[in-house]
Amino acid sequence: MPKRTDIKSILILGAGPIVIGQACEFDYSGAQACKALREEGYRVILVNSNPATIMTDPEMADATYIEPIHWEVVRKIIEKERPDAVLPTMGGQTALNCALELERQGVLEEFGVTMIGATADAIDKAEDRRRFDVAMKKIGLETARSGIAHTMEEALAVAADVGFPCIIRPSFTMGGSGGGIAYNREEFEEICARGLDLSPTKELLIDESLIGWKEYEMEVVRDKNDNCIIVCSIENFDAMGIHTGDSITVAPAQTLTDKEYQIMRNASMAVLREIGVETGGSNVQFAVNPKNGRLIVIEMNPRVSRSSALASKATGFPIAKVAAKLAVGYTLDELMNDITGGRTPASFEPSIDYVVTKIPRFNFEKFAGANDRLTTQMKSVGEVMAIGRTQQESLQKALRGLEVGATGFDPKVSLDDPEALTKIRRELKDAGAERIWYIADAFRAGLSVDGVFNLTNIDRWFLVQIEELVRLEEKVAEVGITGLNAEFLRQLKRKGFADARLAKLAGVREAEIRKLRDQYDLHPVYKRVDTCAAEFATDTAYMYSTYEEECEANPSTDREKIMVLGGGPNRIGQGIEFDYCCVHASLALREDGYETIMVNCNPETVSTDYDTSDRLYFEPVTLEDVLEIVRIEKPKGVIVQYGGQTPLKLARALEAAGVPVIGTSPDAIDRAEDRERFQHAVDRLKLKQPANATVTAIEMAVEKAKEIGYPLVVRPSYVLGGRAMEIVYDEADLRRYFQTAVSVSNDAPVLLDHFLDDAVEVDVDAICDGEMVLIGGIMEHIEQAGVHSGDSACSLPAYTLSQEIQDVMRQQVQKLAFELQVRGLMNVQFAVKNNEVYLIEVNPRAARTVPFVSKATGVPLAKVAARVMAGKSLAEQGVTKEVIPPYYSVKEVVLPFNKFPGVDPLLGPEMRSTGEVMGVGRTFAEAFAKAQLGSNSTMKKHGRALLSVREGDKERVVDLAAKLLKQGFELDATHGTAIVLGEAGINPRLVNKVHEGRPHIQDRIKNGEYTYIINTTSGRRAIEDSRVIRRSALQYKVHYDTTLNGGFATAMALNADATEKVISVQEMHAQIK
């Protein structure tokens, strides 16, 4: 039956900021849903607080609200826009929870809005653990023995019944938040306390342990006529006990017999029928006991998920797009499959003739003190996917695409080490982020397949594959480059070995292996992802490489081509913002008539959607893989400045190989990154920088530090996201830094800068075309200098800086752009102290603020700059004036500390945020208040505030205290702060620090006495002492600031109402015109 005509407009709920467990896969699904529904003539209204998404671009929906995804705000949007229906299945757990809340609060009924895609009852039945268990029993499927608890007493009673170890999962949370595995009562109580706190319904499910069972997922799509298709089966390489988001996964499932697969297929369809999903996609997770084949249903998600993004990219079947059309009444047989050009209907189950491997990417090095063992709580921040003709090829391609310094199965331990075996065994038994490499080491150290299986419970079939690769590596090392004849080299390439790995094994340079392949004329061919295992011809150019006979790439020869290199897997410091830029480059150049080619390996993103570019190569972004694509495509230009450090690292090597890198030249990029070369440019332009030095040894650093003066910012050269960057306060601190952190330098020097305490930091994004410079936006940071710019909230326009100071910065940016010969985007960071402007750094590439600035000003910077790189001047594009909006936009960051108990949430020069939100208001205060609501802050309007500040903040704290009093807060202060306040006539209640006796600060936080805490520190001892305050504030959900500037912004926002007025991006941009 065709689409519904009783609904004319549809509200899509987005997923909000990127957090661990909910990443850019929902931008991909939301963007697809917007396109699909507008194609059908519906009016689409979108709400999503994350500005770094493609779906919040003004052309994606008819009305776009970058507002907090909070039921009261969404109610305002519904009241204003009057949609007929709401689609909550595209925005992850955030959207589902918001939709259920709108239903509970009677908002949907009040405005006559229907829920489409999933009914409130189906969502509740799938998410409510007790109802789900009952539903499964009804259709004869087993679930794990379990019980439900709402209090600690109930939880302990369930544990007595289920036994240890047991698995704890809170209801209605995402990415296993608050859950875990408890092996004893102490761990059990700790996990339950955290879980009860995080579950919006205060409900825990406590399961028998299925640790060591095999885990599978089925991606199912069902329509209202009960047509059901399995899009993809996915098998977890890691056994149960590790969250599926943290597991290596393989599609299609490799170790099921046909009979087992059919049983699981039928079971997953039965689950969708029973839960009542009849208009869209779901994923159903199963566990199988390898000893006896017992099958258990773990859970199902009645929405588009991380796995469905993976399944879409793995098969080419656009689940989100199809689900959106089913939600408005179509059936599967009425929809055509785009990839085959409509030669097959969407009711054909995809079949694939290749293997797909996904490996998660972790960032534990950013979180000192975090528990880096993998459990049922998700901890990975990104993922990489690779496609190959065999399991071995796809696994090795994924390993090199992960960008963790491995080009394949590089050894982790030296076999000469007497502790080697002990270490390998420990890593296999208790999995961390690197277990896959330790498995290869185990085979090198002489463990058998059974031996590894007993430690890991990973299916022997997978282990045999890895063992064979290790044996081949040993053979290469034995015969050397002279033994690599054409036949042997071909065999190795078919198994996915990278040139770089073979070079290391043979003891030669990578270029020599490449030369050898050229001699043998040994190059990959490209196959197409077509959903039908090559049964039907396909017009869609979605390719992967493999070493076989027939090439299906079929590149055009009549059009000018531009290739965009993507950013690879998400990680902290390089996330969705860079993908956003890549997508914009591709869209703009397509509009201008170029054929665009995208190279990337991140399955979550819009850039790897088959219709974002003319041609998509789903390949690792490494030198070898990129050069092979360039060899057959012969592009006119390659863009490396948009994908973060991943493609930038390749710029020089690509240029050396004769690849036309367009935009700012690799040499100019190097001039900005290399300290000494940059220093020459700065001196020539007579710009001010904080006193600094470059050192190569510890004693030299100690000498230079005396000249520059403490505190210092220390860091290795060439980093993104502030890796190994710290503020040190004295010589002892400096020596400690050199002993613990300088190993990251790879013979590169370490940079010392005088730290400008209390300076205001400013980010400026600009575009230069060689003739003029366009200022995109000037953003004033809210946290003072010293907090990494990626972790600081910022305001556009600036909210305290004078016009004169801003003009000085504009002039300096212009001088720098011409001096460095920038063609395209650049980002400059300044610090302002005592009305002096200091230059901090220049990045001649896309910065993570580009999407935010584009949304705030209505100027699509990434598109404009891409056209500049392709040779179209700013004047020709008609974009020559800086836009200063008549409203304020505030970007606030979202930090993942709740996933890492034990890590100090103090902000510093090392970036740790995973995502961002944006708030827009007529005043700075209103915009800041909205950004706080959007980032799930727990800011309250009144209550009791605790003030504990460092020496340098004591005079300014008086003003803040007065503002809080005026707002109706009662005040507490620690000893030193209380004295200063007392002298100013403010008398707070005195509280003890932790070492001063009880009741102390921590007791009072635990008792729920505070609604707001401000705690600023400097010096290592003070930071250690006050760490317990920050951890407790986080744990007990008290809004806290670790900078005084943050405190002042909070005080301003207390007067504003974040839920009072909503404004769409289209209305914002209309005010600028």
From Swiss-Prot:
Residues annotated for Mn(2+) 1 binding in this entry: 285, 299
Positions of Mn(2+) 4 binding: 841, 843
Chain sites annotated for binding ATP 1: 129, 169, 175-176, 208, 210, 215, 241-243, 285, 299
Annotated Mg(2+) 4 binding sites: 841, 843
Residues where Mg(2+) 1 binds: 285, 299
Span list, region Allosteric domain: 937-1073
Entry cofactors: Mg(2+); Mn(2+)
Top-level taxonomic group: Bacteria
Cross-referenced Gene3D superfamilies: 3.40.50.20, ATP-grasp fold, B domain (3.30.470.20), Carbamoyl-phosphate synthetase, large subunit oligomerisation domain (1.10.1030.10), Methylglyoxal synthase-like domain (3.40.50.1380)
Gene Ontology CC entries for this record: cytoplasm
Record region (Carboxyphosphate synthetic domain): 2-403
Chain residues that bind Mg(2+) 3: 829, 841
One Gene Ontology MF term: carbamoyl-phosphate synthase (ammonia) activity
Protein name: Carbamoyl phosphate synthase large chain
Organism: Escherichia coli O157:H7
Gene that this polypeptide is encoded by: carB
